[in-house]
């Protein structure tokens, strides 16, 4: 426990150094939400529950930024700086190392949720029962494991430059095609077919089913679990093969 606490203190210091990045990861989705939701604020025949659903979309967008940029970047930096090798020669085990990374990311997730939810409620008047707010936050955190799996897979790339390029393409592609920026019903049929196969779309389906019907979307849940498990398993296998080569 003491070693895990010490690692978390280090993570906190690193977070302070990357404060500008964290402000952007929360600030940009919040700005998008205020801009696009403002277009529908005074529209009587606007889409039902648009303010609420777009609030959830932009929260997921913010969390995806943390999982696909901050998480892999930190792991890659630790690797090239030999921090991971150093820890292997100390009493700290790698499970504690990864737990500290996950803890740091969970804190980032909670900050994203708190900020974007607060803006939606206080500025745009989004109102839900307390149970719905808590349930939506919980499902966002659990569902975002799929993005963590993607971020971990990015660490297999040989350079930080390539990791950044591929990460940006995935980030924007998943956001647009998966329906975080706009409903995929506006897309041609072939683009809709692609969008429905993406984790961003399935995460939003999970949230919409919970908020609209109070239940769990089983197909979306299974998709996210299988997607995450396959990527985690593939990454662990390839990383092990790479280290033993």
Language-model-detected regions and their locations in the chain:
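A short amphipathic helical element positioned immediately N-terminal to and/or at the very start
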Residues: 4-16, 206-207
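Membrane-interfacial helix-loop-helix junctions in multi-pass membrane proteins
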Residues: 14, 46-48, 127, 178-231, ...
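Hydrophobic alpha-helical transmembrane segments of multi-pass membrane transport/permease proteins
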Residues: 14-42, 51-70, 110-111, 168-175, ...
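Hydrophobic alpha-helical transmembrane segments of multi-pass membrane transport proteins
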Residues: 31, 51-122, 169
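Transmembrane helix segments
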Residues: 35-40, 155-197, 201
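Short helix-capping/hinge motifs at transmembrane helix termini and TM-loop junctions
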Residues: 36-45, 65, 120-128, 156-159, ...
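Hydrophobic alpha-helical transmembrane segments of membrane proteins
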Residues: 44-74, 139-152, 156
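Alpha-helical transmembrane segments and their short interhelical loops
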Residues: 94, 102-166, 215-225, 230-236
